[in-house]
Amino acid sequence: MKLYNLKNHNEQVNFETAVKLGLGQKQGLFFPVKLPIMTPVELSKILKMDFITRSTEILSKFISSEISKEVLHEHVKKAFSFSKPLKICINKNISCFELFHGPTLAFKDFGARFMAQMILCLNKKNESFTILTATSGDTGAAVAHAFYGMKNIRVIILYPKGKITLLQEQLFCTLGKNIKTISINGSFDDCQKLVKKAFDDKKLKESIGLNSANSINISRLLAQICYYFEAFSLISEEKRKNLVIAVPCGNFGNLTAGLLAKSLGLPIQSFIACTNSNDTVPRFLNSGKWNPKKTVSTISNAMDISCPNNWPRIEELFRRKKWDLKELRFGSVSDNVTKETLKELFRMGYVSEPHAAIAYRLLHDQLKKEEFGLFLGTAHPSKFKDTVEKILENSISLPKELKNRNNLPLLSHNINPDFNKLKEFLLEK
């Protein structure tokens, strides 16, 4: 697999290098030189496979030149060892595709665990790596648990202090060992800026073997393609004809993966890019002007991102496929509407959480009579227990994954958004 840097098309690397580097020169994202396409016969065959076998087939379309299908299958099996997503019907035209049945109760488990397996597979020289990543909530836990206890790998996770839930914090800030966590006195965008500055420091990058586990890493992105095929396989042929998928968007990696699935030949009619009040992309799609505003805090904190990293990949995919960006549906939802939507879903017998509620709201409001809609459930409602209970005036129980960490002490350090302070921490052995 060859990939090129979106900021310098002359910089081309193979899959192994892209996984290990994370970003190219000038913080450029890597993007596939060739975009594979399935024939209708291939698609029909692949939809009948089980999740692990199908995922292996999909991923091998991209990386078979570097990793054999047999080896890949073993790593996919280890990465996706949790129960496959469940499809919950809300009504006859709308279902929730739940992606939160992994070890850290969020869709990020798919990408993080596959990336960990790829580094294991490709690190033949037993090199040491420092994984530096920023999280607005769920990425931190998924990455921490995926890499926990791995030899020669140190993980450092930045997150905005006071802007993720305590339950989210407890999932990854209580592990210790090779997992280090730093709360930043600022926003998630401040955390991302620090990560990018670290990658810009060539000497630092080389001295500590710096890598990133955010959705900027191509291995995470490819893994997420797989569950869109799973979603498609679970619905009837009649409903497949006019399928619309609403995606809660933060860094836009999830939507990028869905669009790559469509690029492969999965006949999804359209996607809805769903944001909260941090609506840089909806405003851009509406006006044609890219104008990020200061990030505001919302109850859907994992989407509190004003400068989404993956947007350049979406623009590149639309350019390469000659698709029209006007075909991408979009919308933003305020906290007040999110709260009312959570109550609406609860009255229908479904307990959700703020991110999925935003996707449901926009899907419900934009879905046409002849269409069938899926909205993605990206995190377990219990991760937002305090918020959800307050809105619904009803208690929700904690799953064992959260109960097990509920009373453990937080092991985080705290710094201001100062790159020199972060650099000192990174250089500590």
Curated annotation (Swiss-Prot):
Keywords: Amino-acid biosynthesis, Lyase, Pyridoxal phosphate, Threonine biosynthesis
Cysteine pairs bridged by disulfides in the record: none
PROSITE patterns per UniProt: DEHYDRATASE_SER_THR
Record PTM N6-(pyridoxal phosphate)lysine, positions in chain: K108
Catalytic reaction(s) noted: O-phospho-L-homoserine + H2O = L-threonine + phosphate
Pathway membership, UniProt: Amino-acid biosynthesis; L-threonine biosynthesis; L-threonine from L-aspartate: step 5/5
Function text: Catalyzes the gamma-elimination of phosphate from L-phosphohomoserine and the beta-addition of water to produce L-threonine.
Alphabetized NCBIfam families for the sequence: thrC
Record's protein name: Threonine synthase
